[in-house]
From Swiss-Prot:
Transmembrane segments: none annotated. HAMAP family: Nuclease_YqgF. One of its GO terms (molecular function) is nuclease activity. Its EC number is 3.1.-.-. It comes from Streptococcus suis (strain 05ZYH33). SMART domains: YqgFc (SM00732). The lineage of its organism: Bacteria, Bacillati, Bacillota, Bacilli, Lactobacillales. This is Putative pre-16S rRNA nuclease. InterPro entries: RNaseH-like_sf (IPR012337), YqgF (IPR005227), YqgF/RNaseH-like_dom (IPR006641), YqgF/RNaseH-like_dom_sf (IPR037027).
Length: 139
């Protein structure tokens, strides 16, 4: 079963994919989007869904530290609804608190990557962490 993890922002969607057995997550890419123009990167996402034969989506939920939901949670859930409508595949949600912080820390401490390069990979790594946390919790 292939599961696709998504870190949905207002300008990009980080994409990760599980291995066929659902043990590990691998970051794939970052898809540019524009919420204000209604451009959600679905053309590219469709290519990836078909290429990897995706069975399910996991979308990160950026809850506040006190476990309340803010406007980005609603945007992520709306994106999940869009996925369900378009692909007719199940969508689960994974708490993504601090995944971007953890991803940035990994890039600084372990890879010593400059700020400019971090911006180019941070969402992909965050999607990978969201998916890996989901896989660890579920399987």
């Amino acid at each position: 079963m292939r599961i696709m993890g998504l870190d949905v922002g207002s300008k990009t969607v980080g994409v990760a994919i599980s291995d066929p057995l659902g043990f590990t997550a691998q970051g794939l890419e970052i898809i540019p989007i524009d919420e204000e123009k209604g451009e959600f990167g679905l053309e590219r996402l469709t290519e990836l869904v078909e290429q990897y034969k995706v069975d399910k989506f996991v979308v990160g939920l950026p809850k506040n530290m006190n476990n309340t939901s803010g406007p980005r949670v609603e945007a992520s859930q709306a994106y999940g609804d869009l996925l369900t409508e378009r692909y007719k595949l199940p969508v689960d949600y994974q708490d993504e608190r601090l995944t971007t912080v953890a991803a940035e820390r990994m890039l600084i401490e372990q890879a010593d990557i400059s700020r400019g390069k971090r911006k180019k990979v941070i969402d992909k790594l965050a999607a990978q962490l969201i998916l890996q946390n989901y896989l660890d919790r579920t399987f």
